[in-house]
Amino acid sequence: MAAHVPTEVRTPSQRAGDAAEDEVGRRLLALGWALLGRRVRAGRSELDLVATDPGPPRSLVVVEVRWRRSRNFGLPEETVDRRKLVHLRAGVGRLLEAGRLPDGTDLPDLPVRLDLVAVEPPARQGEPLRFRHHRGIG
C-alpha cells in the first residue's frame, strides 16, 4: 500500500478522519475489495482510499471518506460541494495520468469511479458507527 503521512504529525481532527478511513477500509476489504493505497498524493490532492471493487463491473475506485462527530453542523455528505468535487476529479485525473501509485504500484486498467463514504457516530452509545456509501458521485 502507498506510504502515508505519519499520524504523529496529524491534528486530532485528522486522526479522527484517519480512524474513519481505517474503518471504511476494513469494511471494503470485508466486501471483497482490494485496497491499493491510502492517503495517496496526486499532485496537490490527497485521495483517501484507492481500491478495486470486484463488481460487477470490476472497477478502480477512489473513495472520499467524510466524517462528522455529530449532525450539529450537517451531514458528512454536505461537506462535499462542487469545489471539492472539482478538486477530487483533478486528483483522480493526475493519478490516472501517472498510471501508478506514488509507491510504484501500477493501476489496473479498469473503469474508474469516484465514491463517497459518510461516517457518523452511533445514534446511541454502544451502537456501531453509521456508514453511507454513495457510488459514482462524480
Feature locations, PLM:
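Conserved catalytic cores of phosphodiester-cleaving nucleases, focusing on short active-site segments
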Residues: L28, L47-P76, L88
